[in-house]
Amino acid sequence: MRLSFGKQRYHGGTTVTLTEQGASDSLRAAQAIFQNHSNEVSSPCPPVTVSRNPQTRLSEPSLQKSGRKQEQKKARIRTKQVPKIKTTAPNDVELSKKHRSSPAGKDNVSSTAQMAAALAHSQSKLSSDNNSSHSSALDTLKVLETPNLNGLLGIHSRSSSRNGSNESLTPGQRTPDNRSQENLLTSFSSGRRLSSSSMEPATNKDSNKALPKRRPSPPLQSSLVGSGQLHENENLSSISIDSRHSLNPDTSDVISNRSQTSLSQTINQLSLCESEPSIASSNTTTTTSNQGSGLPNLVPNYSSDMRKKKLVNKFKRKVFGSKPKHLSSQYEMDASSEELGQHEQQPSMRFKTTLRKTSVSTNAENDHASSLHEGNLRYKYNPSNDTYDVYDDTDSDSESDQNQDALTKPRKRDRIKRKIRNSANKTAHHRPIHRTRDRKFNEDKPWKSHTDITFVTDNERKRYESMWVSNRHRHLNLLSWWPSLTGDSGAINTLPEDGLILGIIVRDIWKRSNLPNSLLAEIYTKVDTRKDGTLDRKSFIVGMWLVDQCLYGRKLPNVVEQCVWDSVDRYASTMVVPVSTLKAMAKQKRKQMKEEIKNIKKENRVVLVDHNSSS
């Protein structure tokens, strides 16, 4: 029975070229696969698998019973989940009446045949390119040929429907029936494969407990091949050779689970799967050392111990400070040769390190670096810019005896203390209670030199008189009674010798104090003795003194005392007794008065007693 295939076929966006020999081989391979499945269904026997976890192993009768019961109960439900796609059966292929009415079975047969054809074509192409005489996929499957095709179609439709329902399940949650079908499909295709990641643990029906989800094992694991177990090294060495000529390790998964995919996607997936064994064989050392531990260690020469050591060293540096490093640091560079696999060590390279800020010539730098390497090195602290200058013992300028302590580099703690002491703000100490020097009078802040006294001091009088001299005799001709306007010469003879100041000028001067006008008018009325719009020297000085007293915070007195008027013309004592001293003196005076009263009373008693005794 032959099928007539075209030489080129456009499918899924790609053009596939099939020869007549490849088409016939693909058809025969598909028939052999179908017949093998039908024979396996008639006498189910689960293949021998090796599980890494001993708790997941089950006996063969439990797999048979669970497979039969679940196949009877869920066959009808799962067949409804198969997508219905209109396809045509291959030429000269007769289907049984039982399967002709189901379009899902026809679709699965046609798609499976196409995938098997693509598989055989890819295998034949690889064998022709490599010029090898090994057996192809067709020779591997010839042994399994049986004449029964009707049973094959039935088991294929059931397997496709069950695979559609179990796609969303994890390996630990799949039913034993579905797992047995997968093992049947993988039994003949994984003959020379070292391990298979699709092997999954079976569930225990008696315990009725689902196994926990676990991460799939690495691809390279030990498995039973035929009747004996091969060593791991032999399998790893032979897998790179057999992977090109044997069936793909994942062919069973593609046939059972990928019945609805396009031909182009199948070819791409087959090419990717074929490259996996060769990659695994080249990385045997990495995978064998990391079996069951997840991803391999991709960072060479690195382990958790090195990471812990780095963290401990970092913590010690933070707590105890960094250790003093030699300025003559040496760095070694290793160059690895890929051809010989030997490591050659280059000569050590010495880098110049110095703490000098000024640049020097190249020869001086080399001499300085050599002196640093020899160990003739000392430091001297420079307090001006808070740095350390480096000096050699051979320098003629260095002082040997006097600055021996200054040339040694202090500890890190001492340097930090010195830096804090120089940079921190110094706390201001409390000033002494008694003033040791006289403070100058501040015209902007006159209240700072104020003392509670009842007379004009000498300093105040001098300030007021300076303002008087600079503003007197100005604009007096504006007055109505001024003699120059009336021509009366007698009025000039009655004016005071010190002169007069115009009231308008006094008002302008006093307004600079920012006191209210009402308060200034009240002060003017208290010191105005002439009542003619002018002020004489005494009135102006006393008025200025009252303005300053108001600025100091004292209340304006109702009547200006006579001692204030007298202090303007007389030189008062500059010694001012503090208020506390006056209070102490008053207290002492009251105490003396009490003592005198007691003495007087005592004397009176003595006089009375003497008088009574004499009488």
UniProtKB/Swiss-Prot annotation:
Bias kind Basic residues: ranges: 409-438
Keyword Lipid metabolism in record: yes
Compositional bias of kind Polar residues: 50-65, 248-260
Entry superkingdom: Eukaryota
Residues bearing the modification Phosphoserine: S180
Biased composition (Basic and acidic residues): 365-377
Biased composition (Acidic residues): 389-402
Protein name stated in the entry: Increased rDNA silencing protein 4
Species this protein is from: Saccharomyces cerevisiae (strain YJM789) (Baker's yeast)
